[in-house]
């Protein structure tokens, strides 16, 4: 009897654990170097989990750096380099807020307490259903004292629907077309833009962002050229555009929701320094020691989450843009290079991408396994051109 009870308790714990893990958010930090004249970024040190945020469900607080996984195998920092500027980007994605995720509203709002954040990037799928609008306002208002930019995912237009989990392992032969949005997209967009954040859904912008005085550096403004696409997963992405300031900006940043190869190739072709994306949930349900089983894009599973270098042509046959049954031809990458002012095509073949593991889940599958919810702070250190 005692053995049977122990086995029953073990089975119950195994079933309950993925629900528990889905409500244990963590903050991951990345340190990346921007070298003048070089596309993409280099890791400065291993990423680590920051345990300094309070646990909103238990009041506990940790203070250690905890290095994890393959992302620990990165380039060692050259401590002799003295960056000319530095900005810290808070990357949030896939909140999927609804009335049952009040805990996540509190967590996101608490991130505003990190005064070293200089910029906020929001990469889509903010809703699960329409009840999330007021929660999003409460979650993001404390962060809107900072400059920011956003793009949308499908769950900023259409509410989440129940899908059998095995659905993601097999391509849809006849995908369902949802033509009429049922979420308060216009109201949410107005909330974000009225707070001064840049709408990058198939749009561009240029911002002057302050690199604060830190570690002996003086404060200075840097020019950040911004580009973005609407959600590639549902074919709302148009050909990438870049602002006129792209070639001369201190930093070139791109946002998209779903990291499809056709979009990453375009940003590699125009020498973006960093692309921020979400959508994959890091795989959401992963095998310990193996990783993601599916990422719902055309990328290899190794690109399901984290920071990666992306080479143009990594995927041989990128999925085409399909919108409401229409298949669009590939974008002319040479024309894009010309628009971006990239004269050396051999240099414009790579970029760096951060694929967020996301903070939320659908209310229909509120579980995670070996893939906790994450927010990320990405520190970009720009090296001086006279080094």
Task: Specify the residue positions occupied by each region the protein language model found.
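Short, conserved loop/helix-junction motifs that constitute active-site signature segments
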Residues: 114-115, 140-145, 244-248, 267-270
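Active-site environment of divalent metal-dependent phosphoester hydrolases
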Residues: 97-103, 127-131, 155-162, 200-209, ...
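Binuclear metal-dependent hydrolase catalytic cores centered on His/Asp/Glu-rich metal-binding motifs
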Residues: 163-197, 203, 208-265, 365-368
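Conserved beta-sheet core of the metallophosphoesterase superfamily
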Residues: 259-376
């Amino acid at each position: 009897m005692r053995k049977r009870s122990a086995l029953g308790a073990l089975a119950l714990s195994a079933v309950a654990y993925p629900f528990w893990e889905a409500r244990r958010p963590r903050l991951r930090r990345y340190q990346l170097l921007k070298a003048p004249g070089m596309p993409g970024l280099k890791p400065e040190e291993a990423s680590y989990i920051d345990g300094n945020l309070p646990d909103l469900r238990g009041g506990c607080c940790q203070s250690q750096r905890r290095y994890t996984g393959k992302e620990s195998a990165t380039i060692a920092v050259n401590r002799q380099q003295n960056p000319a500027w530095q900005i810290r980007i808070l990357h949030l994605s896939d909140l999927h807020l609804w009335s049952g995720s009040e805990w996540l509203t509190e967590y996101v709002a608490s991130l505003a307490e990190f005064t070293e954040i200089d910029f906020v990037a929001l990469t889509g799928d903010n809703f699960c259903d329409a009840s999330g609008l007021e929660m999003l306002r409460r979650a993001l208002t404390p962060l809107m004292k900072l400059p920011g930019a956003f793009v949308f995912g499908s769950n900023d237009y259409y509410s989440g629907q129940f899908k059998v989990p095995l659905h993601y392992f097999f391509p849809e032969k006849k995908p369902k077309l949802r033509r009429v949005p049922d979420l308060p997209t216009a109201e949410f967009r107005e909330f974000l833009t009225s707070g001064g954040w840049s709408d990058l859904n198939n749009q561009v912008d240029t911002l002057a962002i302050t690199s604060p005085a830190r570690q002996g550096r003086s404060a200075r403004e840097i020019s950040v050229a911004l580009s973005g696409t609407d959600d590639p997963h549902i074919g709302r992405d148009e050909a990438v555009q870049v602002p006129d300031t792209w070639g001369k900006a201190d930093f070139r940043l791109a946002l998209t929701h779903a990291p499809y190869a056709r979009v990453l190739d375009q940003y590699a072709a125009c020498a973006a320094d960093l692309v921020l994306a979400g959508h994959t949930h890091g795989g959401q349900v992963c095998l310990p020691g193996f990783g993601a089983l599916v990422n719902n894009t055309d990328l290899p599973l190794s690109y399901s989450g984290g920071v990666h270098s992306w080479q143009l042509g990594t995927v041989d046959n990128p999925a085409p843009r399909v919108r409401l049954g229409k298949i669009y031809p590939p974008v002319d990458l040479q024309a894009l290079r010309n628009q971006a002012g990239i004269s050396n095509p051999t240099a414009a073949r790579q970029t760096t991408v951060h694929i967020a593991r996301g903070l939320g889940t659908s209310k229909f599958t509120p579980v995670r396994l070996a893939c906790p919810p994450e927010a990320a702070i990405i520190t970009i250190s720009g090296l001086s051109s006279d080094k």
